[in-house]
Each structure stands twice: as structure tokens, then as C-alpha cells.
Amino acid sequence: MSGFVPTHIFFTRGVGRGETQLVSFEAALRDAGIAPYNLSSISSIFPPHAEMITREEGLKKLSPGQILFTVLARNTSNELNRMVSAAIGYAIPRDRSKWGYLSEHHSFGETEKVAGSFAEKLAAEMLASTIGSSAQLAYDKQKEEYVLEDKILTTGSISSTAVVLESGEWTTVVAAAVLIVE
């Protein structure tokens, strides 16, 4: 049984500003390139054999109104000078017949690097715990990714951060993993 398994995945991010929370969210989705689609929230599994593609390649495979399965991180504020962050982390096993993990992280006061690193670590820890070796998970500073013996192929993240610039203005950030079923 093959089921309904996504074959491609891409990552995107956006920032939006507006007079209302909804308007700023729509602007963030537009900035991320995913506003013309119906977003359906899913949990944190990076499908076996799914190919990671660029945002540009992914958007070419889509049609307006299409239902998109996403792991979406979102944060918003209208507090002047407040920094909002959203990040998606991923961890992919070396054995691509196995599933990996996606994680979402939403925070205040964190830079893109800090938020992204946290989301990446979450995904790596979830993957390591399914392999049964979470105590041996280590960060390789040279490769800038988490490693677990020879079991993790790659880890990474995408993040978006913005500061509320005007009083009364809503600012929203999004980061998303978009999964495509063909």
C-alpha cells in the first residue's frame, strides 16, 4: 500500500505587517509565496524518500486553490519594538527508507540564528530518540549540523524574525515546510 505520501518538500518564510493580525498574517503568507493556497496543518514527519527542492521548484508544481500540507511556525505581535521569530527545523536519516522529523518553534526576542538552531536541535533530538541513541547526538560545528554516528544524513532550519516597527501595527512572521503529493 503506497498511501498518500508526499514526494517533495520545500521550505519558505515570510514577514508581514498590517493594521490587523489577519492582514499581517496574509502579508506574511504572500511574502512566503504560499498565500494563494489552502494550507492544511500536519504534524512533524519528514516523509521517507521525499526530495527536498527549492521554493522556486516547489511553487512551479502548485496551482492556486490547491490544498497544501504544511508544518507552519507562526508568531505575531503588535507590541512596539517586540521581536517575533518563527522557525522550522528538519532532521533526515541517512537511511531514506525511514522517516525524519520536522519541528516548529515560535519565540520572542530570538534572532533568526538562535530560533533556527533551536528548531534544528528539536528535530534532531526527535529523530535521535526514534533511533534510540539520543544520548550520542552531537553538533558538528564544522558541518554546522547534528550528527549521530552514521545515522543522520542532514539537519537544518529556516527561520524568520522581525521587529514591530510602529505602534499599533501588527507584525507576523512565518516559516513553513510545504509537502507536495504528486
UniProtKB/Swiss-Prot annotation:
Residues modified to Pyruvic acid (Ser): S44
InterPro entries membership: Pyr-dep_his/arg-deCO2ase (IPR016104), Pyr-dep_his/arg-deCO2ase_sand (IPR016105), Pyruvoyl-dep_arg_deCO2ase (IPR002724)
Record family assignment: Belongs to the PdaD family.
Top-rank taxon: Archaea
SUPFAM superfamilies: Pyruvoyl-dependent histidine and arginine decarboxylases
Record site feature (Cleavage (non-hydrolytic)), residues: S43, S44
UniProt keyword terms in alphabetical order: Decarboxylase, Lyase, Pyruvate
Co-factor binding comment: Binds 1 pyruvoyl group covalently per subunit.
Top-tier EC class: lyase
Magnesium as UniProt keyword: no
Protein name (record): Pyruvoyl-dependent arginine decarboxylase
Cofactor: pyruvate
EC number: 4.1.1.19
Pfam family, one: PvlArgDC
Protein's GO biological process: arginine catabolic process
UniProt xrefs under PANTHER family: PYRUVOYL-DEPENDENT ARGININE DECARBOXYLASE
Catalytic activity: L-arginine + H(+) = agmatine + CO2
One GO molecular-function entry: arginine decarboxylase activity
Gene of this entry: pdaD
